UniProtKB/Swiss-Prot annotation:
Record organism: Clostridium kluyveri (strain ATCC 8527 / DSM 555 / NBRC 12016 / NCIMB 10680 / K1)
Binding sites annotated in the UniProt record for Mg(2+): 245, 288, 315
Protein name: Enolase
Pfam families recorded: Enolase_C, Enolase_N
Stated family: Belongs to the enolase family.
Any one GO CC term of the record: cell surface
Localization annotation: Cytoplasm; Secreted; Cell surface
Length: 430
């Protein structure tokens, strides 16, 4: 194996994501003609502390959401720095882009520019070596297939309905393999669709493939999922658990949590009690962004009350950022981090966040964004780092299913060495 393979070309273009918004795609060409390609996702409910997604703001084109500035930054500035570099120097490649940007949040080049390049380089390197991406990133010990955290009922910013909490998910922890987990989840999804139809509910889907029915309360969404799990022939709390993503920053106004569908305005303490009631009543194993991103006091109360029995995931709270994560670890809030590549903007920084979380005994959940493409990098990443959990939407819409299908291929490729840890994934809760 040659240990120095030159990058000879870096090219970006504007493509469309799953919401008909422009996004960045990058191709990296190596000296022997090997090509790596990556496309960048985009979020709807974004944390205030995320790296900057550069948009053109030209209202005459794509409602101002064009990404030609980011494309230009790749083609005119990043390419010039990276051409001639060794594709295997991933850390140096990412460091070079950080230095070229020079801001704390990638506000100059755009995280959508740097991430596209970072991932395309990794893909090109893996392809040159004849390795799958998960093998290249993770090495010989990459073997754990993730428990899917499947969003099957949408509310909040992901749907036009009267449900406040953003995502209601299922986690098939009782499955013996990823393949079986996917089958179980798919069966529950179909059963839920039939159930909603029988109740006269709309079965149109939201951004992430989940259904978006108009329900009387957030709790009703949980109830109908439990009913679907049972009707599909599974046992809630044994075969399949429930996970929530309230996206609480979106409902946090003037220091209070506004549950409009239920006519409730709650303090931090009351919001925690609201979750405690739900956890005591239903088989809920994980809650993401239960409190707002700057409600550190609320997070402390929540972690004290539920931190030993429920996975408490920080998304907007941590934004895949080691500085934010370190603050959370020091304050002893949450016990898990959501990993979104585009929140931070390079592969190296993403891996650093996962490593810091694991050292502190926090679990990591690798995640998509609501605006996705056919790019399957996160499927390889979750296996590469043995994270054990992936959040990539319902088993519907091809930009979501692409990730699940890639995981099926990886499980097949790993054969007998593949592990699906199920309930053991949640090693830091009882």
């Amino acid at each position: 194996m040659r240990n120095y393979v030159e990058i000879v070309d870096v090219t970006a273009r504007q493509i469309l994501d799953s919401r008909a918004n422009p996004t960045v795609e990058v191709e990296v060409i190596l000296e022997d003609g090997t090509e790596g390609r990556a496309a960048v996702p985009s979020g709807a409910s974004t944390g205030a502390f995320e790296a900057v997604e550069l948009r053109d703001e030209d209202k005459e084109k794509y409602m101002g959401k064009g990404v030609l500035k980011a494309v230009e930054n790749v083609n005119n500035y990043i390419a010039e720095e990276l051409i001639g570099m060794n594709v295997f120097d991933q850390v140096l490649i990412d460091k070079t882009m950080l230095e070229l940007d020079g801001t704390h949040n990638k506000g100059k080049l755009g995280a959508n520019a740097t991430l596209g390049v970072s991932l395309a380089c990794a893909r090109a390197a893996a392809k040159y070596l004849g390795l799958s991406l998960y093998q290249y990133i993770g090495g010989v010990n990459a073997k754990v297939l993730p428990v899917p955290m499947m969003n099957i009922v949408n509310g909040g910013k992901h749907a036009d309905n009267n449900v406040d909490l953003q995502e209601f998910m299922i986690m098939p922890v009782g499955a013996p393999s990823f393949t079986e987990a996917l089958r179980m989840s798919s069966e529950v999804y179909h059963t839920l669709k039939s159930l909603l139809k029988s109740k006269g509910q709309d079965t149109g889907v939201g951004d992430e493939g989940g259904f978006a029915p108009n329900l009387n309360s957030n709790e009703e969404a949980i109830q109908i999922i439990v009913e679907a799990v049972e009707k599909a022939g599974y046992v809630p709390g044994k075969d399949i658990f429930i996970a929530l993503d309230p996206a609480s920053t979106e409902i946090y106004e003037d220091g209070k949590y506004n549950l409009k569908s239920e006519g409730k305005v709650l303090s931090s303490e009351e919001m925690v009690d609201y979750y405690v009631t739900l956890v005591n009543k239903y088989p809920i194993i994980s809650i993401e962004d239960a409190m707002a991103e700057e409600d550190w006091e609320g997070w402390s109360i929540l972690t004290e009350k539920l931190g030993d029995k429920v996975q408490l995931v920080g998304d907007d709270l941590f934004v895949t950022n080691t500085e934010r994560l370190k603050k959370g670890i020091d304050k002893k809030v949450a016990n898990s981090i959501l990993i979104k590549l585009n929140q931070i903007g390079t592969l190296t920084e993403t891996l650093n966040a996962i490593e810091m979380a694991e050292r502190a005994g926090y679990t990591a959940v690798v995640s998509h964004r609501s605006g996705e493409t056919e790019d399957t990098t996160i499927a390889d990443l979750v296996v590469a780092v043995n994270a054990g959990q992936i959040k990539t939407g319902a088993p519907a819409r091809s930009e979501r299913v692409a990730k699940y299908n890639q995981l099926l291929r990886i499980e097949e490729e790993l054969g007998e060495t593949a592990e699906y840890r199920g309930l053991n994934t949640f090693y830091n809760i009882k």
